[in-house]
Structures are given as structure tokens and as C-alpha cells.
């Protein structure tokens, strides 16, 4: 293993160790820990949305729908299906099932993307978000518009950090693979990509599935942190917040996704004294970003740590000296 990879794995292990040890040691107060968990959940959401909106160049505005599906499925499992004693040991599996349910919904949404792009796809995904919210509001077993509660507080800083690292690792490997080059080709020119034998339908399908899966996982983490969810938590306003984080950090950038999520989450918390007015900040920031800096802070740029290692230089051939 190269020195660079050793540093990456060492950094990941250090983050996990701190996420495990700091809450137990009492070095951080519960308020700071909760903010860090919200930052991590938003990082997962932003990374997943950036795969579709940034790397593939589509414009999806219904990501909160996937988050809501994952949140409700995971919550039903821990409240109504699993015995209480099994909830904590099964929590990783619960999150995966919630993510898988969201991925199935992503499969449904991916089909309109085969024929529509830009504004038309935005309308389709917006309609999907509204449908999910409406369906959740009209299922009495899920609490209807009043919401669903009773979930155990299983989300910890360690689990959030672990999923952030896993999401980042998987997406980093994907975007620098043939898959990543394929979805980038779709972003640049889908017609040309089709002509060069890129299976655009298959790549779009996979991109939506992966993006929706991680949004569903983030929803499960969110539900078991807040211990209460309602359909309004996954409205178009939540999707707008995700768009702000993506375009603030920068499209087509893993580093930008992390920065955008951290900056926006902390900023909203600092503006808490403004009350309801702080929710104006997200839409306003999105408008200003689209006008003055549509590429975001790190648009199409990446920190060296997340870039693939450069190939080793070929050994120089020894001169031929003849027989």
C-alpha cells in the first residue's frame, strides 16, 4: 500500500476513533455533538445528490422524497417490526433496508430521465417529492400529517461518521472509474456519449439508484437522531436545502459537497435566533449562487486527497549495448 493510501486510511481511522471516544469522554457537550451529527447527515445527502446533479449534470429537485422513504421505512422497522432488544444490533441493517427502499423509488424516477432533461426532469422529480409527501400524510398507520414517533435514539456520532466515510469512499471510487467517466460524458453531451457506445440508460439508472440509496440511509440516521418525523420534514423546502448545499460547495466535487454541507448547516444554526426567518436563507442563497457563482466554491475542483494517485513513472530502459 502506498504512503498516500496509508494516510487516507489512518485519517479515516482517526475520525472514527474520535467519533467513538469524544462523546464518551465528555470532552464535547451534547449540543455540539448533535450539530456534528446533523453536519454528517447533510454531508451524506449532499454527496448523494451531487452524483446526479453535479457529475451527471441532471437537475433533480426531489431528493427529500428519497430521504423521507428511507426515514419512514427504517422507523417502522425499529418501532413496529423488530423487538426492542434487537433494534440496536440490527441498526446498520435497518439503515441498509431503508436505503434499499429509497433505491427502489430511485428506479422509478430514473425512467423519466431517459427521455427528459433539465427543466422537464426537475418538474418530474418535484412531482415525485410532492407525491411522497402526500402519500405519507394519508397513511394513518404512519401517523398521517401528525408524524411518526417512538424511534429509539440509535444514531450516534460514530455511526454518522462511519456512513460519511463509507459514502465518500464508494462515491470517490465510482466517479474516478469508467462509471464516473460515463456519467461525465452524459453531462457534457448525451447524444455524443450515445454515439460513442456509452450505455446512457444503464448509467443513469445506476446513478439514481446509488444516489437514492444514500439519501435513504441519511433519512434513517435523521429519524433515529430526532426520534420523530413527519411528512413536512421531507417537503420541497428540504430538497431546496440540499440544492443549496450542493451548489454552495460546488458541483462535481466531493470536497465541495463536504464544505457545502458543513457551512450551510452551521450557518443555519448560527441564525437560529432569527426564528422562522432563517428558513429564507436557503432559497435566497440558492438564487444568489445561481446568479453570481453557479459553479460554487469548489466547482469541478477536488482536494488532492480525493484524487486518484498518479501512475508511477515507467522505469527508463537501459541502453542496448549490442552483443
State each model region's role.
Residues 1-323:
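Transmembrane alpha-helices and adjacent helix-loop boundaries
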